[in-house]
Amino acid sequence: IRKGESYLDYEWKVVKATHYLEFGRSGDRAIMESPFGKNNSALGSLFMPEMAEGKGRFVDQIINGVFASCEMTSWALSAHLGLQKVGGCFPSYEEHVIDLGSGNLASQLSCIYYYLKPSFDKVNPLISKRLRHELQVRILDTYMNEDHFWWMAFNLKPGGLVNNWNPWCNFNVLQCFFLLENDRDKLAKAVYRTMTSVDHFINYTHGDGGCEEGPSYWGHAAGKMYDYLQMLSDGTGGKVSVFDQPIIKNMGEYIARSYVGNGWVVNFADASAKGGGDADLIFRYGKAVESPLMMNYAAYLKSLSDKDGIPSGDPFRLFQTLLSREELEGMSADYQAPGYSWYPETEFCYMTNKNGFFVATKGGYNNESHNHNDAGTFSLYLNTTPIFIDAGVGTYTRQTFSSERYSIWTMQSNYHNLPMVNGVPQQFGSEFRATDVHFDSRRMYFSANIATAYPAEANVKKWVRSY
């Protein structure tokens, strides 16, 4: 409530036309995302205290935020407007895009509509009527009538990519349908369509549960899949639940196994090097799949945090946290990191020893999600301090997810812990991969031939790396 009070005089930001155009001009996406994100955060920070207090003090400001959102041509981010059939980075009034930005806002607005419609109607019925219309045409109708969004994976081709966008967008859409659609037949069709789409994400992921995108993306990938599956289970009265499937548990435990210590995590691909994850989310996921490892890890993370901290996240995660926080706080923080973790299909391997060393290495291929050309690379930590590091990724720009990606130094093998072979670095493409990848848990020994990750001009037949 105190946090919400600080937004009672918030000045709603305008996302200008030039903010969208800047992505095309310079590749800068933050100039558009900053005011858009601030408005969305303000809306959430006003909604939750109104739910907690229920006195109507925050309603007028929420209406201002809703109105500002409805007046926007698009809720999609400038960097994602290439999903429009007309392409570009400027929003078209003739079509709608479901991306991470529009989905997140729509998910929040659907909660606001569901819970605050009576309050809005007391002020003026046109407010909720307008909001319901915008959610219908931008999200519900668009999702049911369009197949061309790559993240849906309905037109997935062999070798195609399915990443965190899939469960993330489908979760947002599912929440909108559950809260807004009153026709049971239409709702059933929509729910089934989301299930078909999310199946592609689960099927894309290896059975070992490794997250190609790294720990900092886990909350948006497997973590959002958990949110989706939990909402699906809740919405169907538990009749549709796959929490007993081994792959779902494996995908969850990845986050606990990738923790080095003192806030450091294994950061392959575009992942950040610090941040152990959302303790409340990890606890709920762990409880759903009956994983003591995840639950103990969550308790450990919680013991490190501010005990009086305000829960954060989208409305669904906030409500779920309020339901589970007391149980989490009652657990003892006795997390013990595994001695090793081996992902035979994803080809990630983590090993520790009694001298305080932690080594993380990978085989893999050079077309993974958020790919770096890094087959065979490694990171080394001593007493949780990074010694040999992965530099990670810089600030996202237009260049990051374009044909120019591998002109960025952080994406190149020669800026990872890998050799230049005859002056030649590794190359991008699914065919450039580590081969003969093996791990012996008895000897704590990992090896991989990385020669096959280099192009022909490297003139290398075999190069075995072992740890």
Where are these regions (language model features)?
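Carbohydrate-active enzyme catalytic cores, enriched for enzymes
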Residues: 222-388, 439-441
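Active-site lining segments of carbohydrate-active enzymes
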Residues: 88-214, 227, 323-334
